[in-house]
Amino acid sequence: FSKQDSDISIQRVAFMCKLLARNGVAVFSAAISPSREAREKARKEIGSFVEVYVKCPLAVCVERDITGLYQKALKGDIQDFAGASDPFEEPLNAEVVVETDKETAEESANKIFQKLIELGYVSQTGAAGHVYSPEEEDKIKERLSRLGYI
């Protein structure tokens, strides 16, 4: 993608995240966003926003890449490839940074979950073992129905 294409894609993702969040849906979005400016615009658009920087050195990305796209980009066969033939601007103030070359997937997930607890987005105890009243169940079912899940 060109920088312009990438920025437009991030704008679309941000718009959808905003719509979902505005309607009470917890939204997780995984997007390659090489531009700090595009990420900041998304942050402003969405409002309630936690940036997770999944950090990985280029050499490790190349090693893990089963598609061969990084190699093609580094050879010049693919243009506009973020992090290889095009720059990737690292976030300056991401709420969470996971270093996938140093952490296990479980450690990274736990780091993200702990930050969400710290910021008040999720409860540490969760709802395990909670028994819902008939009224609570009705409210949950009504909401899921309105959202189109049931």
What do the predicted segments below correspond to?
Residues 1-10:
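Flexible beta-alpha connector loops of hexameric P-loop NTPases
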Residues 2, 17-72, 80:
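ATP-dependent NMP and nucleoside kinases share a basic, alpha-helical "lid"
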Residues 17, 112, 116:
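Hydrophobic "lid"/C-terminal helical patch
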Residues 55-58, 63-111, 119-124:
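Small-molecule kinase domains that catalyze NTP-dependent phosphoryl transfer to phosphate-bearing small molecules
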Residues 122-135:
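Short, highly charge-biased, low-complexity peptide segments
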Residues 133-150:
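Short acidic, low-complexity intrinsically disordered linear motifs used
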